[in-house]
Amino acid sequence: MNEFVNTLIARRSTKKYKPDMLPKDVLDQIIEAGTYAANGRGLQAPIIIAITNKEIRDNLSKLNASIMNAPIDPFYGAPVVLVVLADKKVPTCVYDGSLVLGNMMAAAHALGVGSCWIHRAKEEFELPEGKELLKSLGIEGDYEGIGHCILGYPAADPAPRAPRKENYVYYLD
């Protein structure tokens, strides 16, 4: 099988991480892969916020947990959180941001880094705390939180992949 296709098929969500920080060059490659995701009309609506600061990461984790009303770390101990947001003025913003997340997760797997998509970014950045984070970075505009790509080195083997469901694909010949 083609190496790239195998990378896509072999990727799994990682839900237990070592505390070790990723080297900057590895993180930068993952982020760069995200910036080259396909996007509607080439408008590049998404933005990526790379969080490696533990205090900020932990505060965002608490905010995310409060949205789902659960006393857990929704980021599973991952040391890096990449938040993807997208400009609401662009009609394809959610799709574009989703492709950014997918590219980053595939790149992470190719580099031996675990990843998982975590939801509730939309709700986070509708709250005052989320808006304040954007303001502190000088980010202006009307952005919607699309998702989080958490990253780190896996502390356990991923779960085996589930078989694909029947009737996943239909061909019209």
Which residue stretches match the model-derived regions?
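Acidic, surface-exposed loops and disordered segments
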Residues: 1-173
